[in-house]
């Protein structure tokens, strides 16, 4: 391992200690919390959209998020280990078969939606068994009206 790769690995480990990013992939809808500085004030702004690409590896890894804002498509590239990213929340998983979803740029409206991935194996389904109460036999006297 050369010195540059070693320094990058140390920086990745240092940033990973501060915040834990979820394991998301292309097609997932994510909410990225970005620290924005306006003048002297700093605030955290949420940017929610579909992850359409991941590129690079190690310290140079990036991901691209696309959202529709007021009818216009907006894409933003985030460095994975940027100190300006406060965190990433996974909103929903998407079912895609491509590594890059650049074809979404040409689609409009409902055609640009991505189907949700449903993983039935990981879902904890608890079957609640009804406890059958012991049947109580009531002694009912039958009378006949004459």
UniProtKB/Swiss-Prot annotation:
NCBIfam families (UniProt xref): rplS_bact
GO biological process, one term: translation
UniProt key word Electron transport: no
Organism: Bartonella bacilliformis (strain ATCC 35685 / KC583 / Herrer 020/F12,63)
Alphabetical UniProt keywords: Ribonucleoprotein, Ribosomal protein
Its job: This protein is located at the 30S-50S ribosomal subunit interface and may play a role in the structure and function of the aminoacyl-tRNA binding site.
Keyword Ribosomal protein annotated: yes
Name of one Pfam family that matches: Ribosomal_L19
Assigned protein family: Belongs to the bacterial ribosomal protein bL19 family.
Cellular component annotations (GO), alphabetically ordered: cytosolic large ribosomal subunit
PROSITE patterns registered for this protein in UniProt: RIBOSOMAL_L19
The protein, known as: Large ribosomal subunit protein bL19
Cleavable signal peptide: none
Single GO MF descriptor: structural constituent of ribosome
SUPFAM superfamilies registered for this protein in UniProt: Translation proteins SH3-like domain (SSF50104)
